[in-house]
Amino acid sequence: MQSMKETASNIAASAKSGMDKTKATLEEKAEKMKTRDPVQKQMATQVKEDKINQAEMQKRETRQHNAAMKEAAGAGTGLGLGTATHSTTGQVGHGTGTHQMSALPGHGTGQLTDRVVEGTAVTDPIGRNTGTGRTTAHNTHVGGGGATGYGTGGGYTG
């Protein structure tokens, strides 16, 4: 059940990100058609790129939050009544009892969520996609033919 919720949330985050990116592109095109000033056109392009980056960052944060919640639920961390906290800085917080807190920036606090904090970067948890086709938790002794370091010692060549 939790896996289905995570998948649905990830799909929704991707869809929202795609819509936000499309909206930013269309707004840029409309702004460029309104003006002849190259500075205004460049500003429209920069605004579009900022909105696209923000949409992508929100999608990644949602996916990371979902993955952290899945890991916390599977690990049985004992933080309250089946709840766990997750911080985007990687620090584990205190259990919140029956009040689930969100790791999304500004969510439930009244703060603006459409601003990017300079100097921050998105990181992947250990064992997640590193872009190399393998996770950081790859075991070199498992899988794929050749000498893996394990075997029966038999001579079967089937």
UniProtKB/Swiss-Prot annotation:
Keywords: Stress response. One of its GO terms (cellular component) is cytosol. GO terms for biological process: embryo development ending in seed dormancy; protein homooligomerization; response to cold; response to osmotic stress; response to water deprivation; seed development. It comes from the Eukaryota. Residues 1-12 have a biased composition (Polar residues). Residues 18-39, 47-64 have a biased composition (Basic and acidic residues). Residues 142-158 have a biased composition (Gly residues). Over-expression of LEA46 confers plant tolerance to severe drought. Under water deficit, the N-terminal region is necessary and sufficient for conformational transition from disordered to alpha-helix folding. This conformational transition is required for chaperone-like activity under water limitation. This is Late embryogenesis abundant protein 46. It comes from Arabidopsis thaliana. The lineage of its organism: Eukaryota, Viridiplantae, Streptophyta, Embryophyta, Tracheophyta. The gene is LEA46.
